[in-house]
Regions:
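Alpha-helical transmembrane segments and their juxtamembrane interface "caps"
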Residues: 59, 92, 113, 143, ...
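C-terminal motif of bacterial Sec signal peptides marking the signal peptidase cleavage site
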Residues: 14-17
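Mid-length scaffold segments of soluble, non-membrane domains
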Residues: 97-167
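Non-transmembrane, aqueous-exposed alpha-helical and coiled segments at domain scale
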Residues: 250-251
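Bacterial signal peptide processing site
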Residues: 19-22
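A structured, mid-to-C-terminal "fold-capping" secondary-structure block
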Residues: 171-240
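Bacterial N-terminal signal peptides that target proteins for export
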Residues: 1-7
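N-terminal Sec/ER secretory leader and immediately downstream segment
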Residues: 24-107
Length: 251
């Protein structure tokens, strides 16, 4: 009687073990099977979308640029002498910091519009592109996006940056107005007799153009970080496709 009662349990154990063995065998066979073109291009597209989405979300959040020293947008190098000398004037340091805050807020506002351009480029990726990216260096995917989107991003991005820096912010003053106030003060000094004798030079920089390139530099830096993470950290590969495609690089 005890044997009869144990038989069903024995069958369950056998069939369960067989199912697990079959699943393990299928996984092993899958891992040994060469990557197909469909898997490669699908995995690369998914990885790029993940990288772009994460990067846009990080930088598009409040203080995404402003409190990240790696991407924080500072005044142009040509303005270093302005910062040094304006800082000597009462309230000068606060004026500089207000401008920096508004500049970075403008970038945080504009970066949200970059994702559709990246997605369009990703959709147009060929198998040749995908294989080259998979077998390329740690920034191969980022370089692909830079090559295929940068000019379009600048063309579409600059008007948005311009609109952002002209947007009224705290105190009903825009970033562009703050920048113009600073540069005007400096240029007045530079053009004065004292300024000329000191060898000061005027600063004439298109703020929106400068900000566009700096904002995009920060975005591509974040995308590169995401790519490195997926390439090197198995835990960052959220789907089975990403695990299979990028897992092929681990061996």
């Amino acid at each position: 009687m005890k044997t009869n009662r144990l038989l069903p349990l024995l069958f369950i154990f056998i069939f369960t073990s067989c199912a697990e063995l079959m699943q393990l065998a299928e996984q092993t066979a899958s891992s040994d099977r060469p990557l197909s073109s469909t898997e490669i291009i699908g995995g690369l597209k998914e990885a790029l979308v993940v990288g772009v989405t994460n990067s846009s979300s990080i930088l598009g959040a409040t203080d995404g640029y402003y409190k990240d020293d790696l991407v924080k947008i500072l005044l142009p190098p040509e303005a270093d002498v302005i910062v040094k000398n304006i800082g000597k004037i009462p309230g000068g340091n606060q004026l500089i910091e207000d401008v920096l805050l508004k500049i970075n807020r403008a970038a945080e506002d504009a970066v949200k519009d970059a994702k559709p351009i990246f997605v369009n480029s990703i959709k147009n990726m060929t198998i040749t592109d995908a294989v080259g990216i998979l077998k390329g260096g740690e920034n191969a995917a980022t370089n692909y996006l830079h090559k295929t989107t940068y000019d379009q991003l600048v063309e579409l991005y600059r008007p948005k940056i311009k609109a952002s820096v002209e947007k009224k912010l705290v105190g009903n003053v825009s970033t562009a107005q703050s920048w113009n106030t600073i540069t005007k003060k400096w240029n007045d000094i530079a053009k004065s007799l004292v300024g000329q004798m000191a060898g000061f030079k005027t600063v004439d920089i298109e703020l929106d153009e400068y900000l566009t390139h700096k904002a995009l530099d920060g975005l591509f830096l974040k995308i590169a970080d995401e790519e490195k993470l997926i390439r090197k950290d198995p835990l960052a590969r959220a789907s089975s496709l990403l695990k299979r495609v990028f897992g092929s690089l681990d061996t």
